[in-house]
């Protein structure tokens, strides 16, 4: 083959690699306001049934607040704390309480310096298959494991809608 033939073949190959298919929009699922509200209200109702006054926050896939509810009689810090828990669970794709162990194993990861970060237990990521579409966090129960149990009950309630 001549040099011109190689150049033409290279240009043709380059044109094939840059096709409109690589410029398509992303297809993704996001939490609806209705599902987010259901998760927050169910988490609060579950905790309330156990005698805990809590606040709940549900964040979307980008960490933005979708729903935040302060429970009757809860201290003001529970709003911020429920957000930090949810934001941490969304950002790192794990239950918020697992961050403490991660930091012990890798203190140089720097997560502790992020705004909105916490190691407190009480939030879970909301998954659609392997995709994290958000997270829910609760604060106010006497112990993060109780907060987390309320979140789990709420996510379990809407699990059939997360497909």
Describe the predicted segments one by one:
Residues 8-20:
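Bacterial N-terminal signal peptides
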Residues 23-163:
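Flexible, solvent-exposed loop/hinge segments and secondary-structure transition points
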Residues 1-6:
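N-terminal secretory signal peptides that target proteins for export/translocation
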């Amino acid at each position: 083959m001549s040099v011109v033939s190689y150049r033409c073949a290279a240009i043709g190959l380059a044109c094939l690699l840059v096709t409109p298919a690589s410029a398509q929009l992303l297809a993704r699922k996001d939490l609806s306001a209705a599902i987010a509200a259901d998760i927050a209200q169910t988490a609060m109702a579950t905790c309330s049934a156990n005698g805990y006054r809590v606040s709940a926050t549900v964040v979307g896939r980008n960490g933005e607040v979708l729903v935040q509810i302060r429970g009757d009689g809860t201290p003001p810090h529970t709003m911020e704390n429920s957000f930090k828990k949810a934001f941490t669970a969304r950002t790192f794709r794990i239950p918020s309480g697992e961050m403490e162990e991660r930091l012990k194993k890798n203190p140089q990861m720097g997560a502790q310096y992020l705004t909105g970060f916490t190691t407190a237990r009480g939030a879970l990521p909301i998954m659609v298959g392997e995709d994290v579409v958000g997270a829910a966090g609760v604060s106010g129960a006497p112990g993060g494991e109780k907060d987390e149990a309320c979140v789990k009950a709420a996510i379990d309630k809407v699990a059939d809608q997360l497909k």
